[in-house]
Amino acid sequence: MKPTMMSNWPGFINRFVRQVRHPLDFRRPYRITGFPDNLSPLGYFGQTKQYARAAQEPYLVTVVQGRSKKPCSPRERANRRFGEDSWFVSSTPRAEVLGVADGVGGWRDMGVDAGRFAKELMGCCCGRSEQEDFDGRNPRSLLVSSYQELKDRDDPVVGSSTACVVAMHRRDLTLYTANLGDSGFMVLRNGRVMHRSEEQTHDFNTPFQLTVAPSHKLDSVHCDGPEKAAVSRHPLAPGDLVLLATDGLFDNLPESMLLEMLRKFHGVRDEKELQDAANQVVEKARELSMNASFPSPFAVKARANNISYSGGGKPDDITLILASVEVPKVHR
């Protein structure tokens, strides 16, 4: 953010706090910005995928799908953004790393691209996951170092976002996770939930969030450090499905419906077939988000928190990463 924007800060702060902390702060669309060329998903990622398969190491068959709340340029997938959501997928000889982040929309009222922070955070995590010193067992370290980088830049990246980063370590076939806020992950096996991350929230629809803001205003906004990210580890088995998503999916698609849609895809190796599954899930979530009478998970939570909400889905950006665990026979 340029210094001239900071000079307008006092006039916006009270309105901004209401936007960020209000329980019905629906996130809004974004403007397209470029993604660093050196983080192209077709470069290092594709090369290490080939390495893993040639070396007969465990790997993930991974697909991505998403929908912005409002129509946006078709370039958004290349920019790894769906509205104010962002994502990354990284593959190294040690691990496969996946991440999603959801930018907090309240920043838009201050003239800030609410999705930029999420995009830059995921870009940093992607780059750092491919460095030699990342062993694939501590995804929270990616959040710590990436968050610090955004804060330390000469032109700090101002904003907030949730973050969920997971890594499948090839040698021990274990999923290591770090989750902050209300994005999250699931591990599915034979149509059952083996594990699902828990939401971290201050209040209803006010998730934990990484934030970069002027130091004298930190007390006025929610600012949760990456050390608050919940970490866990989960043994994986061949055919397991690993799912990462932003709240645009979880707030609109009931778990029972999600499980039913994905039940037949256990053990799927074909990328096109898995992509079809992701497409169906995202399209169903988008459809339900526009249904004013559907008892969505968001509407159910609103009533449980005595929040006045007319019911139905929650229009929002939706991002989904869906991966199937593939283990060559030599490792079974």
From Swiss-Prot:
Gene behind the chain: fig
EC number: 3.1.3.16
Cofactors that this protein relies on: Mg(2+); Mn(2+)
Lineage: Eukaryota, Metazoa, Ecdysozoa, Arthropoda, Hexapoda
GO biological process, one term: dephosphorylation
GO molecular function terms attached to this record: metal ion binding; protein serine/threonine phosphatase activity
Organism: Drosophila ananassae (Fruit fly)
This protein's name: Protein phosphatase PTC7 homolog fig
Keyword NADP recorded: no
Binding sites annotated in the UniProt record for Mn(2+) 1: 102-103
GO cellular component: mitochondrion
